Amino acid sequence: MPRRDCFMALLETKGLSINFGGLWAVNNVDFQIEPEQIVGLIGPNGSGKTTFLNIVSGIYRATRGEAYLAGENITRLRPFQVYQKGISRTYQSSRLCWDLSVADNLLVGIYTSQDYTLADTFFRPKKVNGQIYDCLDKGLELLRYFNPSLVDRRYDLAKNIPHIDRRRIEITRALLSEPKVLLLDEPTAGLNDEETMTMMDEIRKIKEKMKGIAVIIIEHDMKVMEEVPERIVVFNAGEKIAEGDYQQIISDQNVIDAYIGGEEE
């Protein structure tokens, strides 16, 4: 049953924790994000940021604690069920198929997002194909929003596309299901400084294009978080140690100690 609080975050975790062989990789994390918010997660290497996203997206099963999406408990759902409920994500390492075209990579995401059965594919091909290609048109329009030249290159193989455009394709593919929450794990990994600024600006514009969406960004560089997220959450040793805007975070003694005492990602 959905929770009926007077205030309901779009995504909320309560005491979320996971234990691997006696080590609490994520420990007692309370977190909230509202519609149309962008929140950054940051912390030293191994601090639990990606593990936290893996629990929220159903890849890992929490040892204790709960996660709610729009008031519905999603803690025990499998990844595809979480995806169907409205959480989509990208990964630090590319999930594109290098020997498929840009358009075909979008089609892979579309087919997954529509939850078609084998029977649908064989016995209702016209309906399935019509819906798929309608979604492809939407995907190409999203690509045009990020980079118009990508639409002209939709038949190029992914391996021949610049790295920043591969990131755009992955984000576009994640948006095709029209998620409530978008999780981005180091979307600027492998980009130079100029490309990083461009990418972060494009992420900021996502909430203008997709009304109501909430975005969670993991980044390894504190400076990258200066302009875009409204709020930053800092992890260290599996725990949330600080939360606030950029200026509050960079002056927080717990954060300073965490970065001086550990290797930054």
Please provide the spans of the model-predicted regions.
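Short, Lys/Arg-enriched N-terminal segments with co-localized hydrophobic residues
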Residues: 1-7
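Glycine-rich phosphate-binding loops of nucleotide-dependent enzymes
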Residues: 7-265
